[in-house]
């Protein structure tokens, strides 16, 4: 199964979309505010829609503070887990690297990541990408937490419902809409807006770790979005994808006010 990660960051400025295709690996790249990023493809595990929210490493974190989505009624367990994992790494990147990135090192066999004895993930860079992520996070300072925003979650859900049932992979909806138009349907006033999408990854932590390692993406644009200090709000939606089992759309903003 393929897993595609796409990155889109809207900062006040011009949008210049670039696209490329390589076999069955569809890749979109966008240049916004002077930055360029692209998508990547890896093998992923089977679809497991919603798991328990139990965290065996909870003792290492101030969960009541970091779990900003725990009381909202419009997110599933996995969607809340995505926000929790993003807040963990934003609050203490070095600790996150030690707990969740470094332990992956021994599981690489050349370009394959061994999920278990019988399941492996084909990567583009192998252990080198995880090591680069570890070193980068160790050098970062913490940034402010993300808080759930209903309008962003609704915008993300619209995109999941739209392209998921069609088996598509894109930031662009079937109606030609993009993250900005979807967000503006449910709110306004944002200062900046970003979006990450994953396909085929089925747990909150795996979604965030995959985006952080950003295997095959030279500028690690997905990691940059997660760690961008300017973002304070997020909306997450997961759902079925006819080709890859599950997909997750994560929208980010600051200054956004839901309708």
Regions found by a protein language model. Give the residues of each.
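A structural boundary/capping signal
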Residues: 23-48, 59-60, 79, 83, ...
């Amino acid at each position: 199964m393929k897993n595609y990660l796409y990155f889109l960051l809207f900062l006040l400025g011009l949008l210049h979309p670039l696209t490329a295709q390589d076999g069955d690996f569809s890749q979109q790249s966008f240049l916004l505010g002077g930055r360029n990023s692209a998508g990547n493809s890896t093998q992923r595990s089977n679809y497991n829609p919603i798991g328990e929210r139990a965290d065996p490493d909870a003792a290492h974190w101030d969960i009541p503070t970091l779990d900003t989505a725990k009381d909202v009624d419009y997110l599933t367990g996995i969607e809340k887990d995505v926000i929790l994992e993003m807040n963990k790494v934003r609050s203490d990147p070095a600790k996150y690297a030690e707990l969740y990135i470094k332990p992956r090192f021994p599981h690489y066999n050349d370009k394959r990541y061994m999920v278990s004895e019988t399941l492996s993930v084909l990567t583009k860079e192998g252990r080198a990408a995880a090591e680069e992520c570890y070193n980068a996070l160790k050098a970062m300072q913490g940034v402010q937490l993300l808080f759930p925003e209903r309008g962003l979650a609704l915008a993300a859900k619209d995109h999941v419902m739209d392209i998921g049932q069609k088996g598509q992979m894109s930031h662009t909806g079937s109606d030609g809409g993009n993250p900005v138009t979807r967000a503006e349907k449910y709110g306004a006033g944002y200062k900046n807006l970003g979006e990450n999408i994953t396909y085929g990854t089925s747990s909150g932590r795996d979604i965030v770790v995959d985006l952080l390692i950003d295997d095959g993406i030279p500028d690690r644009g997905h990691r940059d979005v997660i760690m961008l200090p300017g973002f304070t709000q997020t909306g997450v939606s997961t759902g079925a994808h006819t080709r890859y089992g599950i997909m997750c759309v994560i929208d980010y903003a600051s200054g956004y006010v839901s309708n």
